[in-house]
């Protein structure tokens, strides 16, 4: 897919605070979040519930999940950079 091509969003449903809700993200984000959850010994649903509980009022859940994936990727890159500088 080229730089200007539209990404396909994939919806997943979760129960958050007793209510069923759907979140639409690109497949790459779902894969990254599933891997992060597994590394922490959680299910994807548990990770989504935790992110939902921490987000600020008015903050979109999909955005919070994307930011988490990006932050974790940046942390990993920083660690790799530190190791390569040693």
Where are each of the predicted segments found?
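Amphipathic, hydrophobic secondary-structure cores in small proteins
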Residues: 11, 15-69
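A detector of short terminal or domain-flanking linear segments
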Residues: 1-13
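Short, solvent-exposed charged binding patches
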Residues: 70-86
